[in-house]
Amino acid sequence: MTTRTIDNIRNFSIVAHIDHGKSTLADRLIQQTGTVALRDMSEQMLDSMDIERERGITIKANTVRLEYKAEDGQDYVLNLMDTPGHVDFAYEVSRSLAACEGSLLVVDASQGVEAQTLANVYQALDANHEIVPVLNKVDLPAAEPDRVKEQIEEVIGLDASEAVPISAKTGLNIEAVLEAIVKRLPPPKGDREAPLKALLVDSWYDVYLGVVVLVRIVDGVLKKGMTIRMMGADAAYGVDRIGVFRPKMADIGELGPGEVGFFTGSIKEVADTRVGDTITEDKRQTTQMLPGFKEVQAVVFCGLFPVDAADFENLRGAMGKLRLNDASFSYEMETSAALGFGFRCGFLGLLHLEIIQERLEREFNLDLISTAPSVVYRLMMRDGELKELHNPADMPDPMKIETVEEPWIRATILTPDDYLGGVLKLCQDRRGIQIDLNYVGKRAMVVYDLPLNEVVFDFYDRLKSISKGYASFDYHVSDYREGDLVKMSILVNAEPVDALSMLVHRTRAESRGRAMCEKLKDLIPRHLFQIPVQAAIGGKIIARETIRALSKDVTAKCYGGDISRKRKLLDKQKEGKKRMRQFGRVEIPQEAFIAALKMDD
């Protein structure tokens, strides 16, 4: 590599909405440049997890080095950074984009620009990227390349006259994409003689190598045997092995400025290698950290409990292993009277939550119950203390609380205008505040501020069903705002059930409580005594349903005879039921929990 100059390197990422053919295009580029022999090719080369392939999404950032001989006769090294497309992983996307100078914007020629395309393009523009638009799926009968070009110019403001029309599936025009990368994207800048400065793009745990760190070198050279320092985590390590991905790992001697590769060292914990950190040489340190490094904050919390209590230790081990690979996932132990021992886990968003739960169930064979997802509330106490509340069951006495603040998000929704009315109504029902409404061709772009609390429950599913699956949705957490929030407890037979308590807005508490009670009434089996199911705010009951008792016909053996004989038997039964109600325990089956937590509005 030392023979080639920095001018012959191109670092680029592919920006696209889910399902617009990003991973397929990556496959074609790998194939076209002969990086992988044809017999070793598989679909979605860069999506290494099964779950990534099945859901057709990219979760972890990946990278591959392509070597390409261009029409001008020169050899180029192209580093493709494959980024996650989903909003939960926006920070990973921003770090991957910071490691590149340019992006390919892939837009499906039949679908047009979607909400996440927008979010990711704006991130790429923030990173000062040169952007080459690519129209994918032009071989489909429904493709309308000219309309989509207009859309790109209108919505994003990019000149789409030179957009490259391709079909990643059939391999049409892939050569033109490679030429566009070489000609239209800028080479990296960097000083070989300066002290080492590198951006930590991603890291993961490998059973044999320990922690593998993916880096983009900005200045200086990374060599074997060097001692490096992570500036954000303030830890030093020796470098054992350096290499690049041709998707498989291949060792090389050193990485120079502008290059992307990996190194391994004596690193034990992925938590020490934080995405976005700056890496420098321990002896000759760089003075300035790279900008944009931040700690990843969990946004959504929920409890995960094993269905079988004997699995608790296995669950603890499984979480430790996942945490090795995904430092943005956090957990701590908690106990629940209803569900036993488990963990309170923090996630970047709902998709992240689903994926972690699915990976735990699939990779470690665990059966799990998850409690209702909740967000982090800030409580301003009367004594001036600021508390963070992760679990609604831990809410302190309301008399001690001055104000409750909840996180709000700025959501961008793109929808065909036929469904606009339904989408606006949904946002209004969820306490949304409309910020903006624009038309782009036949589609409306709506911007709303919404409380995250209203979105975590089932907002996405409702949005999809209202718009027949056509609306796309993207959000980022904007700020905390004061809200009139109250803790709603569910009481079964006058006993509070901790797993079902939740924080709700006062205006929606009654409807939420009534729905919950009705649902539980159908789910809890009848007992020999009457069971009240109540929703309460503090000491005030706001909704109640009663599960009727099963009763035995105690008078069946009396034929005729005196009425007082029957009355005696009935009174005796009544006494027994009363005593039973006082001391009886209500068994709430696990299915009832799972169904109650999946409650639709």
Curated annotation (Swiss-Prot):
GTP binds at residues 19-24, 136-139. The keyword Lipid biosynthesis does not apply. InterPro entries: EF-4, EFG_III/V, EFG_V-like, EFTu-like_2, G_TR_CS, LepA_C_sf, LepA_CTD, LepA_IV. It comes from the Bacteria. Disulfide bonds: none annotated. It is a peripheral membrane protein. Residues 7-189 form the tr-type G domain. It catalyses: GTP + H2O = GDP + phosphate + H(+). SMART domains: EFG_C. Transmembrane segments: none annotated. One of its GO terms (molecular function) is ribosome binding. It holds the Pfam family GTP_EFTU. Its EC number is 3.6.5.n1. Its main location: membrane. GO terms for biological process: positive regulation of translation. Belongs to the TRAFAC class translation factor GTPase superfamily. Classic translation factor GTPase family. LepA subfamily. Required for accurate and efficient protein synthesis under certain stress conditions. May act as a fidelity factor of the translation reaction, by catalyzing a one-codon backward translocation of tRNAs on improperly translocated ribosomes. Back-translocation proceeds from a post-translocation (POST) complex to a pre-translocation (PRE) complex, thus giving elongation factor G a second chance to translocate the tRNAs correctly. Binds to ribosomes in a GTP-dependent manner. PANTHER family: TRANSLATION FACTOR GUF1 HOMOLOG, CHLOROPLASTIC (PTHR43512:SF4), TRANSLATION FACTOR GUF1-RELATED (PTHR43512). This is Elongation factor 4. It comes from Methylorubrum populi (strain ATCC BAA-705 / NCIMB 13946 / BJ001). The gene is lepA.
